[in-house]
Design a protein with these regions (language model features):
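Divalent-cation
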Residues: 1-170
Length: 170
């Protein structure tokens, strides 16, 4: 298993989709995962520590787990079938550990909320991981950081976005 960090979240409103990239902490591989736009916004908000106007799923799960004095110890992406990734949540409460199946988008948002480590199995990386050219990766990271530094418009949009904004114009 390889420890991963969340790299970027990219949005394509025309397709109603987002891509979250996981970057190998001690290596050169990147794992892109296609997710829904709402899930992408939840992860983007967690990265930027921007609260949602109303609690979303990972906020509710976080509050419940905290209330039961449980903790998310780690997230493991352990399978991919027909381009669908699978994640496991490792939750502990005292001496008890429970493993729960989760969508990667929810698992990643929870990992950010709990500041829990994210791991990906070698089998999953072998299937979907891409080798990242370090220079290009560093250039993209700098561009992404510059975009985040000037993202007040995006933050304002995220705070005010409504479901109707994505309605079919027909």
């Amino acid at each position: 298993m390889q420890k991963m960090n969340i790299g970027t979240v990219l949005f394509d409103q025309s397709k109603g989709a987002a891509v979250v990239t996981l970057v190998e902490e001690q290596g050169e591989r990147v794992l892109p995962i296609f997710i829904g736009i709402w899930e992408g916004m939840a992860i983007f908000r967690e990265i930027n520590r921007t609260a949602s106007p109303r609690p979303v799923l990972h906020d509710i799960l976080y509050n419940l787990l905290q209330g039961f004095q449980a903790r998310l110890e780690k997230v493991v992406l352990d399978a991919v079938q027909e381009s669908t990734y699978y994640a496991q949540l490792y939750v502990t409460q005292q001496d008890l550990t429970m493993i729960a199946d989760a969508r990667p988008s929810d698992a990643l948002a929870l990992a950010l909320k709990f500041q829990a480590p994210i791991y990906v199995t070698e089998a999953v990386l072998a299937t979907g991981g891409k080798r990242a050219d370090f220079a290009v990766g560093e250039e993209l990271r700098e561009e992404a950081q510059a975009a985040l530094d000037t993202s007040e418009d995006v933050r304002a949009w995220l705070e005010n976005v409504r479901p109707e904004d994505f309605a079919d114009p027909q």
